[in-house]
Curated annotation (Swiss-Prot):
Mitochondrial proton-coupled zinc ion antiporter mediating the export of zinc from the mitochondria and involved in zinc homeostasis, zinc mobilization as well as mitochondrial morphology and health. In nucleus, may function as a secondary coactivator for nuclear receptors. It comes from Danio rerio. It is a multi-pass membrane protein. This is Proton-coupled zinc antiporter SLC30A9, mitochondrial. GO terms for biological process: intracellular zinc ion homeostasis; regulation of mitochondrion organization; zinc ion transport. Residues 90-104 have a biased composition (Low complexity).
Length: 573
């Protein structure tokens, strides 16, 4: 703004005269207002620039008179003012200044400047910890601050949207009000802390008494008989995969008993491998039954997403058990048979038991195949896709174990037949090694598929695209980013996405529920920045609540259209 002074240090006091031009009807003498600043040594510099007059439609002229504190230049003689070049604005403003009689002698430059004043709200400093706007529920207020319901009656109550699907709104309190009430009731923070410790001790004793009473109640029911109807958990356990597992446990237990008798009678290594195979199947399927019973438990505070992964955990342990007990012992017995061959007795009973085992294992295999076909048809998958993706780990374990059992029976019968024909016991030992290899392959597949499921496997791409398109078709959504949809087991899906909402649509959704005339009247009554701030804070908070309601609406509609989606997390981008 001062090109002739930009290169000089500010060291000399300067005096500024402000002169305004009044309207023609109120033309008066000069009005001079001095102000002070610093300017460089030497010379007198005079500049003209104008400000808009907010009181009248005229220009305000300002004369800057620069005076040297010594009144001389470097050599002590008066220094003449330096005359900068005048601009077009200065040339246009000079005649007006002359007509007003306000141009002082020595004017060399005039500049017209428009100053725009910007009103800015003062920024509030909240600090590292700010809890004055935190809400707290009645249950938390009573538990954390040791208050009674009567203590909360006279506090400010605020209705907010509920985060739960079964309720639309619930009542909360300001945390600052609750803290103040707690200090009023207990007197100090130390007294409140002592009361909390006492209540924790009482709660611990209460939990111990509940556990003791539950044991007594169980003993009482066992003595007199439990007349309660069969629970939903037991009914669920006897359907679908639970039914398949229970059938497999019964059949494999009988097979183990008869194969063990045949091995004791014949001494066949292949028969020993088959007996161990049936024992491993029985133990693993009992473990699967435990996993199924635990997977249908309801979620609790420690496990908010439920226990559906217990099926995968049980199947994983089952795979490890098949490898250790089935494959390991079969290989060991086969190697010992090769190193130390033993004569084999009559194999007639062994053939009969193998034939019966083939029929029973085949029946269990058919039950597992039918159950998998039914489940795959329900989810729109092929039989192969359902098995490879391990959608139902318990049924998969039964299927693979029974398939391996049928193949193992055929392999053991073939090797025993070669031993009977040739009299060479090495064929029987090779049969034991073959059964062990078959069991090792099955266990490796089970370990791999269940590990993949426990790590968090994504759902099919077509299904994920369907969920994404449903959200993108909503008018309140601009775009969907960072979509993650994982299979939680038991046909449950967890969906997460970053949503870019259309602010105009959300705001219009809020305005459609308001009285526009009333809002217009509120706008017209705004006169000061404080009133404008209160107006924006009021409606801004309501718009944020509307945005939260839009998120809840999308989550609810997504669950209704896709029942397999149990948990939805939509993050505002």
């Amino acid at each position: 703004m001062f090109p002739c002074l930009a290169h000089r240090p500010w060291q000399v006091l300067c005096r500024v005269y402000l002169q305004q031009r009044a309207p023609l009807s109120q033309r008066s003498s000069k009005i001079s207002k001095p102000c002070f600043g610093w300017q460089s040594r030497g010379g007198v510099h005079k500049l003209w620039f104008s400000f808009p007059d907010f009181r009248v439609t005229s220009l305000t002229w300002t004369q800057v008179q620069n005076c040297s504190t010594s009144g001389s230049g470097k050599d002590g003689s008066p220094t003449r003012p330096e005359e900068p070049k005048t601009t077009e604005k200065a040339q246009a403003a000079q005649p007006a200044a002359k007509g007003a009689g306000s141009k002082p002698q020595g004017l060399t430059k005039a500049e017209s400047i428009q100053v725009k004043v910007r009103a800015v709200l003062k920024k509030r400093e909240y600090g590292l910890k700010y809890t004055q706007n935190n809400f707290i529920t009645a249950v938390r207020a009573m538990n954390e601050f040791c208050l009674k319901p009567s203590d909360l009656e006279h506090l400010r109550k605020i209705r907010r949207r509920s985060p739960h699907d079964d309720t639309e709104a619930f009542t909360v309190f300001l945390r600052s009000d609750v803290e103040a009430k707690a200090l009023e009731v207990w007197g100090s923070q130390e007294a409140l802390a002592r009361e909390r410790d006492q209540r924790k001790e009482v709660e611990r004793e209460y939990q111990e008494n509940i556990f003791r009473n539950q044991k007594l109640l169980k003993e009482y029911k066992d003595f007199w008989g439990n007349t309660k109807p069969r629970s939903r958990k037991r009914a669920t356990f006897l359907q679908g995969p639970g039914k398949v597992v229970m059938v497999a446990i019964c059949i494999n237990g009988l097979n183990f008993f008869f194969k063990l008798l045949a091995w004791v009678y014949t001494g066949s290594a292949s028969m020993f491998s088959e007996a161990i195979h049936s024992l491993a199947d029985t133990c693993n399927q009992a473990l699967l039954a435990l996993g199924i019973s635990q997977s249908v438990r309801n979620p609790d505070a420690i496990h908010p997403y439920g226990f559906s992964n217990m099926r995968y955990i049980a199947s994983l342990i089952s795979g490890v058990g098949i490898f250790m007990m089935g494959a390991g012992l079969s290989w060991y017995h086969g190697i010992m048979g090769l190193l130390h061959p033993q004569p084999i007795e009559s194999l007639l009973w062994a053939y009969c038991i193998l034939a019966g085992s083939l029929v029973s294992e085949g029946a269990t295999l058919l039950v597992a195949i039918n159950e998998i076909k039914k489940s795959a048809r329900t989810q729109g998958l092929s039989f192969y896709e359902y098995v490879m993706q391990s959608r139902d780990p318990s049924t998969n374990v039964v299927l693979l174990e029974d398939a391996a059992a049928v193949l193992g029976v055929v392999l053991a019968a073939g090797c025993m037949g070669l031993t009977s024909l040739t009299g060479n016991p090495y064929y029987d030992s090779l049969g034991s090694l073959g059964v062990g290899t078959l069991l090792g392959t099955v266990s490796a597949f089970l370990i791999y598929t269940n590990t993949e499921a426990l790590l968090g496997r994504s759902i099919q791409a077509e299904h994920m695209q369907k969920l994404t398109e449903f959200l993108e078709n909503d008018p309140a959504v601009r775009a969907i980013h960072d979509v993650k949809a994982t299979d939680m087991g038991l046909s449950k899906v967890r969906f997460k996405a970053e949503v870019d909402f259309d602010g105009r649509v959300v705001t219009r959704s809020y305005l459609e529920k308001q009285d526009i005339e009333q809002i217009l009247n509120e706008i017209q009554q705004v006169k000061t920045p404080e009133e404008l701030e209160n107006f924006m804070l009021k409606h801004g908070e309501n718009i944020i609540d509307t945005l939260g309601a839009e998120v809840d609406r999308l989550e609810k509609e997504l669950k209704q259209r896709n029942p397999e989606v149990r948990h939805v997390d939509l993050e505002i981008l």
